[in-house]
């Protein structure tokens, strides 16, 4: 990302995910219809009002689910995000936490006032090579989500204190 040009589109991808042939075209079109003013994603979540545990206190729109209407979310799964570099520039080398990319990304975007939105799509538009891998970040999260819960509470607090951001 450090070497991306002005106005380029950046796609964050994961080698465990199967992307459809029209992925880049549809994500780019989604962004352009919104004047590149937001971050686009496939997998996203909205935090519940009272967060006790990150894993259980969010409503997830899983990347495999059919979604009829594009909508705003608090968190995007960064394995399925796209954005225009005029909207966002990042240097991940400065990030404090390892393996907490989704929450760190959401906090940065929220602090900068950049909306996060999921694209409408049919069921299984984006698939997986393998589900429930024992060595995945998600498996580790299931053992202990303490740090993620603290980060999610900070994100939720920001949204609570800035309700106008919820309308974007």
Spans of features found by a protein language model:
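Conserved catalytic-core segments centered on acid/base and nucleophilic motifs
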Residues: 10-14, 18-19, 105, 109
């Amino acid at each position: 990302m450090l070497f991306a040009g002005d106005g380029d589109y950046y796609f964050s991808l994961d080698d465990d995910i199967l992307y459809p042939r029209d992925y880049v075209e549809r994500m780019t079109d989604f962004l352009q219809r919104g004047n590149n003013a937001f971050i686009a994603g496939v997998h996203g979540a909205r935090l519940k009002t009272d967060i006790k545990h990150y894993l259980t206190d969010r409503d997830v729109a899983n990347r495999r689910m059919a979604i009829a209407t594009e909508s705003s979310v608090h968190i995007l799964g960064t394995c399925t995000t796209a954005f225009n570099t005029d909207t966002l520039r990042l240097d991940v080398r400065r990030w404090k936490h390892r393996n907490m990319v989704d929450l760190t990304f959401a906090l940065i975007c929220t602090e900068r006032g950049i909306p996060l939105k999921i694209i409408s799509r049919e069921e299984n538009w984006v698939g997986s090579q393998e589900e429930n891998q024992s060595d995945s970040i998600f498996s580790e999260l299931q053992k202990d989500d303490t740090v993620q819960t603290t980060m999610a509470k900070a994100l939720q607090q920001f949204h609570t204190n800035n309700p106008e951001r919820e309308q974007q």
